[in-house]
């Protein structure tokens, strides 16, 4: 457990002098732990200075904040610092973005100011929660989109160097956090570089790793073919990716079929999520598709099943070319000998299902690539907190179960704490993020393991 805190500095760190200072002439190479990127210290930084209303978070009605937008390598980054900086730095790693989206830029209209309009942007909401509590906050847009785990780990880790330049001082403590794919990035950095971080926070993170993420969407693709044959022209395990317009048409047809006759989709939902019974502490497993327990009627219930299907299918159908390119032209998925089972299915029904699911062979080079980018070990030296929704259709419970088992196997359970929230969806609210962050900070500073609030 990292307890390298010292008393907080009493004076706020002033960065105004840095805004007019060139650190060197020409391009620099920023390097940290083998990661590197070019940096122009004389670039035209966009500097925002303003007041943030922190009264909703128990702070002052007008907190002075300085924000800086810069570029490192091929990616934009943001650093925010409150005038009453407490000395700690929080890094944020964003989640997956479809490969047809532009890389290297944030997905909102810059500048991200300090008025009410910032609440319309997820990053603005998180920034407000963090900065209003005295922390500095930094985030990278990543050089690339798609399954950019490698780029995300590099660009987020290098924020350690860049943020220090803008803050004007070495942070007392540094916390790395992220959502979904970004949660995997945050935990991966915590595993590999515990000397750089004091704690890590993952929300809905892919903590089972990228091989498990591929298994999810690739199993879903094969099972979709068994229940809805012929709707997709390309064969499982091959491209091309669909255009956004083509996927929208596909999604509309799936939704219409499901509402007209939900029996097929309900039957598909009763398939046991592949391999989940081996990870479930109770040995039961989870359904392939979740329904929203809070759905008010049958139409909404079927709609939640449709969303549970289309989420993973969008990851596959819109990004299959990106996955193939990163995996040296191959897939890391193999179901040639996998036996699909169902809840309350007869042996004959399961045999019929297995006969209808297309079979795919894994490419060893693709397996190797995704093992390195990234397969978490669960071996921890610093506190790690994870927020997970029990009915997450994008990052199912198997990821949490897998990571908890890895932490136990490596003797790291004392460094890992999961906050399980009973709900449907792939999100944590900004308030939940802040609650978990403050609990993580207390854990690091005092050694007190978090006790999570009971959710309705």
Protein language model features and the residues they cover:
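Conserved alpha/beta-hydrolase "acid-adjacent" motif
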Residues: 394-399
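Primarily recognizes the serine-hydrolase "nucleophile elbow" in alpha/beta-hydrolase
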Residues: 173-228
């Amino acid at each position: 457990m990292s307890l390298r805190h010292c008393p907080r500095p009493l004076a706020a760190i002033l960065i105004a002098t840095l805004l007019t200072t060139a650190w060197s002439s020409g391009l620099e190479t920023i390097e940290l732990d083998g990661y590197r990127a070019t940096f122009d210290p004389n670039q035209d930084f966009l500097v925002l200075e303003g007041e943030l209303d922190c009264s909703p978070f128990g702070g002052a009605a007008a907190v002075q904040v300085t924000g800086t937008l810069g570029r490192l390598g091929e990616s934009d980054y943001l650093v925010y610092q409150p005038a009453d900086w407490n000395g700690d730095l929080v890094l944020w790693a964003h989640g997956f973005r479809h490969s047809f989206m532009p890389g290297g830029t944030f997905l909102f209209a810059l500048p991200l100011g300090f008025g009410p309009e910032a609440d319309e942007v997820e990053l603005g909401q998180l920034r407000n929660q963090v900065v209003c509590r005295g922390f500095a906050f930094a985030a990278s847009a990543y050089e690339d989109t798609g399954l950019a785990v490698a780029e995300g780990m590099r660009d987020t880790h290098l924020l350690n160097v860049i943020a220090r330049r803008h803050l004007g001082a070495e942070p007392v403590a540094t916390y790395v956090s992220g959502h979904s794919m970004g949660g995997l990035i945050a935990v991966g950095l915590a595993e590999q570089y515990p000397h750089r971080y004091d704690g890590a926070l993952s929300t809905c993170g892919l903590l089972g790793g990228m091989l498990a993420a591929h298994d999810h969407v690739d199993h879903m693709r094969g099972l979709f073919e068994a229940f809805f044959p012929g709707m997709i022209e390309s064969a499982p395990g091959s491209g091309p990716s669909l255009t956004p317009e083509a996927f929208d048409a596909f999604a509309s047809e799936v939704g219409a079929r499901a509402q007209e006759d939900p029996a097929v989709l309900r039957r598909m939902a009763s398939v046991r999520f592949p391999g989940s019974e081996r990870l479930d502490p109770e040995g039961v497993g989870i359904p392939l598709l979740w329904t929203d327990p809070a759905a008010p009627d049958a139409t909404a219930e079927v709609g939640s099943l449709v969303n549970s299907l289309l989420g993973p299918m969008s990851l596959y159908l819109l990004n299959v070319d990106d996955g193939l390119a990163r995996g040296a032209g191959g897939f890391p998925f193999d179901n040639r000998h996998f036996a699909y089972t169902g809840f309350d299915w007869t042996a004959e029904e399961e045999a019929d299902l297995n006969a209808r699911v297309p079979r795919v062979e894994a490419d060893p080079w693709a397996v190797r690539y995704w093992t390195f980018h990234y397969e978490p070990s669960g071996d921890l030296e610093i506190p790690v907190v994870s927020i997970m929704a029990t009915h997450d259709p994008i990052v199912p419970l198997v990821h949490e179960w897998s990571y908890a088992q890895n932490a136990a196997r490596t003797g790291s359970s004392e460094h890992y704490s999961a906050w399980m929230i009973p709900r449907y969806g792939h999100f944590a609210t900004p308030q939940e993020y802040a609650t978990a962050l403050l609990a993580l900070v207390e854990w690091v500073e005092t050694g007190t393991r978090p006790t999570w609030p009971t959710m309705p």
